[in-house]
Amino acid sequence: MKIGVLALQGDYLEHAQLLKELGVEAVYIKRSEQLREVKALIIPGGESTTIGNLISQKGLSQAIMKYAEEGNPVVGTCAGAIILAKKVVDRAVGETGQPTLGLMNIAVTRNAFGRQNESFEATVYVEDIGEVRAAFIRAPVISDAWSPARITGYIDHPAIGRVGVAAKQGSLIAVSFHPEITGDMKIYEYIISLVKK
């Protein structure tokens, strides 16, 4: 089985390593034609504006949208969740106008938990997946979801309260956190299960 990891910027190497540990061949996606090789796609964390710009510059936008519309699983982690969202605001500056794929009916707030030094780890219960040990690094929150998307995971944060950190829309999944940093395999096992259906 081959699963793609978008390899334009961000922590794609860490995702690929965990996939390899599960016996899956990770394909570093840099060109649209590579999507034909893979059964699912992970859009990693990194810098969401940079990733969005590179997707556009490399001519990947239409290819990824078509890939998702064909029902292939696409998972966005942290910045990847921002890339999947229809609406993006920043905690400090408001509307960002940044390029996204807009595939999921979700709104996200960038940097919702604060700066890098306010990063933390938490255990999150995500519907269909279970408890996941998650790292939140300058992470977004999923502030809204509308049909057919739904929020599937929440955390209670001492500073900002109960917030959405996972969402699902068909075979599209967005998570605010970095599962690849904690090494928790449950997200990857779930992606594999979606491919095998």
Where are these regions (language model features)?
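Short coil/turn connectors at secondary-structure junctions
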Residues: 1, 37-38, 70-72, 98, ...
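A secondary-structure boundary/capping signal
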Residues: 8, 77-79, 104, 138, ...
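N-terminal beta1-alpha1 cap of cysteine-dependent amidohydrolase-like domains
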Residues: 1-57, 62-69, 185-197
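Amide-donor transfer/coupling interface in amidating biosynthetic enzymes
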Residues: 110-197
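Cysteine-nucleophile active-site neighborhood
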Residues: 48-124
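Hydrophobic anchor at the start of a short beta-strand
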Residues: 26-27, 74, 172
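Redox-cofactor binding/interface segments in oxidoreductases and associated redox assembly factors
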Residues: 43, 76, 175
